[in-house]
Amino acid sequence: MHLSQLLACALLLALLSLRPSEAKPGAPPKVPRTPSGEEVAEPQAAGGGQKKGDKTPGGGGANLKDDRSRLLRDLRVDTKSRAAWTRLLHEHPNARKYKGGNKKGLSKGCFGLKLDRIGSMSGLGC
């Protein structure tokens, strides 16, 4: 029985490792720039160059804009999840305020609430 469970787990792990992972796109390729900051056109492969007047299929500029917005959206989600993990791991930012023994002058009731003068005198706070 244990051997079949072990074999099933190994098979599942093998299938998961073969499945292509959904990786985030890497950094966009850097475009060489001139010292004045203008982009330099990269030379095309032999015979595959396009003329200045030719339009790229799919709208060229729209694809670049979509890629940038998708990258920004992915970064924003990552920031939110990172903040959630930080809050989870660090119990409270002002934890020192709540730690420590009882301070002088604070009377605590039965449930940890501060009692007023009448409740502390008469015992009606509980």
From Swiss-Prot:
Record flagged with keyword Secreted: yes
Signal sequence range: 1-23
UniProt keyword annotations, A-Z: Cleavage on pair of basic residues, Disulfide bond, Hormone, Osteogenesis, Secreted, Signal, Vasoactive
Biased composition (Gly residues): 46-62
Region of interest: Disordered: 20-71
Family matches, as Pfam families: ANP (PF00212)
A Gene Ontology molecular function term of the record: signaling receptor binding
Main location: secreted
Propeptide positions: 24-73
Compartment(s): Secreted
Disulfide bonds: 110-126
UniProt cross-references to InterPro entries, sorted A to Z: C_natriurtcpep, Natr_peptide, Natr_peptide_CS
Similarity annotation: Belongs to the natriuretic peptide family.
Protein name: C-type natriuretic peptide
